[in-house]
Regions:
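NTP/phosphate- and nucleic-acid-binding module
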Residues: 2-368
Length: 368
């Protein structure tokens, strides 16, 4: 922007302006024309006065050793995938694997983003989880559909609300040059729809290019048919930070209760909650000794909190706001007959259980 000197990606400007993925389908010339014709405003200053589009290297460049010349130039990896491709034959032979099979990796990636933002949604250094699934040519679209469904089911198992998820297939103009099919799983963040998980059919482009440059054979010999081929690849790629952000946004809830008060609560699915249970003595003076005893026992099985300060209602709220699924209250009944009150975070309903039943009860609720 010439007015406020803020840099933006042209495709993101158009996407945000239209609340669609139109910017991804246009050429640079078409993007410039669209921005001018529609007077797309700068998100910061509101003016529509932009420079022409400039090419921008998304890879971080540095130098290895003490000299800074072209021979010592190196780049931080923008994805983890290529390390898997160059090790394809090594893994296949050492593990004696038959196609189809997959190789997964978790690691740091680096991208020189023009406009990082929206908390941890777009950052320059991030943790990436990628799977390269190698399959026989001709079967890749069946596996592509399989992983689309598998990835969505995984997100639903984390408690992500289905109404905030959508699968968006890339059209031909938007497809990367190496792909014959790509789908983004998008989540409806507070700032709008954003890509969470990309599933791409990368054909055999990567292995073929590594073969071409390295002169090493990366072909697979099918032991059943004696057929030799370069496998096709299905790649589900997920950023850990974006998944964390999705889980946080999905869990945050602000509720108005029947008495007119409001409460803020993180409704994590119990398996994902950082703390599983909080132990609360009803009256510190009379119940804290028994409560501490129970706290130590539960801590052997779960991440457990202990809170004895303030009235019980405020302690429930403190537990709710950090997403603890279960609050166990120790009272006179505990001292007399070894029963406790267990409060559910989401429904606020309470039940009475024997102390010896607690671990099994919580474990069952946390089944994933």
């Amino acid at each position: 922007c010439k007015e406020c000197k803020t840099r933006y990606r042209a495709d993101n400007l158009i996407n945000d302006f239209t609340n669609s993925n139109l910017g991804d389908t246009l050429t640079n010339e078409e993007r410039v024309s669209y921005i001018k014709d529609n007077k797309v405003p700068c998100p910061k200053c509101g003016k529509s006065n932009f420079t022409d589009i400039r090419e921008f290297n998304l890879m971080f460049k540095t130098f290895q050793g003490v000299t800074e010349d072209s021979k010592s130039a190196v780049y931080l990896r923008p994805e983890t995938a290529q390390g898997i491709f160059v090790n394809f034959m090594n893994v296949q032979r050492s593990m004696r694997l038959k196609v189809p099979f997959g190789i997964g990796q978790v690691g740091k990636s680096f991208r020189n983003e023009i406009t990082p933002g929206n908390f941890i949604f777009r950052v320059r250094e991030f943790e990436q989880m990628e799977l390269e699934f190698f399959c026989k040519p001709g079967t890749e679209l069946d596996w592509f559909k399989y992983y689309k469904d598998k990835c969505k089911d995984f997100l639903l198992s984390l408690g992500i609300k289905e109404e905030n998820l959508r699968l968006r297939d890339h059209d031909k103009e938007e497809l990367s040059f190496y792909s014959n099919a790509t789908t983004d799983i998008e989540y409806k963040f507070p700032f709008g729809w954003g890509e969470l998980w990309g599933i791409a059919s990368r054909t055999n482009y990567d292995l073929s290019r590594h073969m071409e440059v390295s002169k090493e054979k990366l072909e697979y010999l099918d032991p059943d048919t004696n057929e030799k081929y370069v496998p096709y690849v299905i790649e589900p790629s997920l950023g850990v930070e974006r998944l964390f952000l999705t889980v946080l946004c999905n869990a945050y809830t602000k509720e108005t209760l029947t008495d007119g008060t409001t409460r803020e609560v993180m409704k994590f699915t119990p398996a994902l909650a950082p703390y599983k249970v909080t132990v609360l003595p009803l009256v510190k003076k009379f119940h804290s000794e028994k409560a501490l005893e129970l706290y130590k026992e539960l801590s052997k099985h779960f991440m457990t909190m202990y809170d004895e300060g303030g009235n019980i209602g405020k302690r429930y709220r403190r537990s709710d706001v950090i997403g603890v699924p279960f609050a166990v209250t120790i009272d006179d009944e505990t001292l007399n007959n070894q029963t406790v009150t267990v409060r559910d975070r989401d429904t606020m309903e309470q039940i009475t259980l024997k102390v010896e039943e607690l671990v099994d009860y919580i474990n069952k609720k946390m089944e994933f």
